[in-house]
Amino acid sequence: MRSGILIRSFLAVSLLAATCLTAHAEAPVSDNVKQAETASQFLTTPQKVVSDGAVTIRGQHIPYQAVTGTLIVHARGWDDSDIGPSDPKAEKKNPDAVASIFYVAYFKKGAHAENRPITFVYNGGPGSSSVWMHMGAFGPHRIVTADDSHTAAAPYKLIDNNDSPLDATDLVFIDAPGTGFGRLVGKDKEKAFYGTDPDAAAFTDFIAQFLTRFGRYNSPKYLFGESYGTTRSAIVANQLASEKGIDLNGVMLLSQILDYDNSIDNVKSNPSVDQPYVLALPSFAATAWYHHKLPAQPKDLKTFLSEVEHFALTDYTSALQDGTAISDEKLEQTAQKLHQYTGLPVEYLKKADLRVSGGEFAKTLLGDDGMDTGRLDSRFSGPAIDPLAQTPDYDPQFAAMQSAYVSAFNDYARNTLHYGTNPAFNDGYEEYKVSAHSIGKWAFVHKQPGAGRPAKGAPNVLPDLASAMKQNPSLKIMLNQGYYDLGTPFFEGIYEMQHLPIPRKLASNIEIHQYESGHMVYAHAPALTELHDNVVNFINKTHG
């Protein structure tokens, strides 16, 4: 879902074991100032805790080593030649911003680095931890949640994940700066990391540092980002190639958004742009089909969606382009057709000028029953907080499973990974931050490759992914989308892939998969099984 993802600390090789053991000896400090200094020192020093485990995936027993820790990443523009200030007090007064980025890595035991792929996994947000991908999709253990309804309160059940891709690749779950057990410290720390470009730079530096510290430069390398994580992946893939000299084997995208002008969320603020309505229509249709709100219910979803996609690109696009010049007859015909495809009332559609945002659709489809549909997964629904509001006040899908994920990971991290209880930090308690709550502070400013200056407004990272593909023509891309995703509609992702500024022959490097699920494709167990198979096949055919 939000997309973001990973976990904490790691010290130089000769100090790793010492860090894990001596931190407890340094911890409980009676003086508040000393305690704060100890915690600050702890946060700005790489940490590392190692544990062992095993999981059976598709009948294959896989013993693994789990490494949980943090790496320290400096704000963009930092130069390591500046290390060693002559006045420690001056540094203490006004230290540069740094991010302690939390991660959890799983390494298959006995595998040789050059033959063993490694995949860096994260969610989006922006400002989300990787708890969603970690506990719901790819980790060796996953949380069990209800399929399309609210998961009952604790106790929750954690099971071995038969669909983890650990059978094909080592996994590194990365939590975005300011999330997980990671923290930001220093001057202007939020400004230094809460933005499209500084966030991508932090991930780029983290990955390069991780490859060095763990000796994985010669391993086949992959990115897997969800939601805003796909935005990040496009930039990071390009920066790894152009700034670090690191070619990737593949980039896997889940619930993609690369051009925010295509978003159906805030489309009303850009009234001259109709494309988001066109690209969201198939997801509206899939949602109405799932809830049996269509005037005539088609039997086959995929056949139905092909018909809707054709209408969206032809008659619907034509009607929207007419604007206020549309004839009464064409307005009526288009509204009637939209009614057949969405289940929304004809008069409502006409009153909306044939233009319905994602939030308005989620509010209206089940509105007569006093229910809102989910945004991230429209299979879900929940009682409307305000039945008279124009858009929902909450996302029923997110509310349905947040507690399960958060509870499961906190228990798993502390009791299985043995992380988050170091006495050096706040008397032994560390909060796992699922979100940095940074969206309101986020600088959506992005400098595209070759641009003279950053562009303000909604980011468009299609040029970044295209640049990565041009620099490395063997780079393969895999797009995964859920039919019931109103946050990043699946047809939008297809459109973006078809409009990358790349030579046509490079388009063959892209493969696309859809699933009968939502934004968090893996929340639907059969879809998770499909996702595993597609990921493993993609990795196996793109290295060696």
What role is predicted for each listed range?
Residues 502-519:
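Catalytic histidine neighborhood in serine/cysteine hydrolases
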Residues 475, 489-499:
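Short alpha-helix in the alpha/beta-hydrolase fold that links the catalytic acid
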Residues 518-527:
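Catalytic histidine-centered segment of alpha/beta-hydrolase-like enzymes
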Residues 140-144, 241-340:
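A catalytic-pocket lid/entrance helix-loop region that shapes and gates access to the active site
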Residues 26-37, 78-192, 498:
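N-terminal cap/lid subdomain of alpha/beta-hydrolase-fold enzymes
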Residues 166, 176, 193-211:
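Alpha/beta-hydrolase active-site loop
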Residues 216-227:
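Alpha/beta-hydrolase fold nucleophile elbow
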